[in-house]
């Protein structure tokens, strides 16, 4: 996020439309992704009745499969898997950075994506590949339903991103050229 913020600050100073628009796309998409992740982990904290640590997630993929699968989709979106809004974010960020010849920023975004793969894999490993395999427990619909609304939005905006992109382009126009009546 810090890398993206720095890059966006640079493109804003240059008043580059593609950079500002990609920043808006990223802010929207990233908010959905992180919102879904935090909601899922928050639900695990309620179920676990304690602070959630990496070790406490052992077997949760089997114990709470509905919420765990939502967390998996959100995490894959954070990494930038195609058909998720995270992929759209990364695609537009890379295009804007390349257009502005910001090759160091491209490398930093690529490294941060690789790090996301590493740390998210540790979560997946604990949830599904640890020795502990629980029997599935009933999950509260009123809690996992909002998590899944966000998760489905992540997929929908990954497949049909036109409204977000158009709104981001319009917002970039207004920000760069100023609102004219």
Give names to the regions the model predicted.
Residues 50, 62-67, 121-181:
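Cytoplasmic/organellar membrane-interface segments at the starts of transmembrane helices
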Residues 1-12:
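Single conserved hydrophobic/aromatic residue that forms the stacking wall/gate
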Residues 24, 28-32, 41, 107-115, ...:
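Hydrophobic alpha-helical transmembrane segments of multi-pass membrane proteins
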Residues 6, 35-106, 135-153:
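Interfacial and helix-entry/exit segments of alpha-helical transmembrane bundles
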Residues 22, 87-97, 166-173:
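Membrane-interface helix termini and inter-helical loops of multi-pass transporters
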Residues 10, 71, 75, 113-119, ...:
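Helical transmembrane-bundle signal
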Residues 10-26, 96-104:
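Helix-coil boundary and interhelical linker segments in multi-pass alpha-helical membrane proteins
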Residues 34-38, 104-138:
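Predominantly late transmembrane helices and immediately cytosolic-facing juxtamembrane segments
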């Amino acid at each position: 996020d810090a890398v993206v913020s720095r890059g966006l600050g640079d493109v804003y100073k240059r008043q580059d439309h593609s950079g500002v628009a990609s920043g808006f796309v990223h802010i929207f998409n990233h908010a959905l992704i992180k919102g879904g992740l935090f909601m899922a982990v928050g639900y695990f904290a309620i179920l676990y009745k304690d602070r959630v640590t990496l070790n406490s997630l052992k077997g949760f993929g089997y114990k709470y499969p509905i919420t765990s699968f939502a967390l998996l989709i959100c995490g894959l979106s954070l990494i930038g898997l195609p058909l998720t809004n995270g992929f759209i974010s990364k695609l537009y960020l890379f295009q804007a950075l390349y257009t502005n010849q910001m090759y160091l920023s491209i490398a930093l975004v690529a490294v941060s994506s690789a790090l996301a793969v590493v740390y998210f894999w540790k979560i997946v490993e604990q949830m599904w590949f640890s020795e502990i395999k629980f029997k599935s427990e009933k999950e509260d619909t009123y809690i996992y339903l909002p998590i899944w609304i966000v998760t489905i939005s992540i997929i929908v905006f990954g497949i049909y991103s036109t409204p977000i992109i158009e709104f981001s382009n319009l917002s970039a126009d207004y920000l760069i050229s100023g609102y004219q009546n």
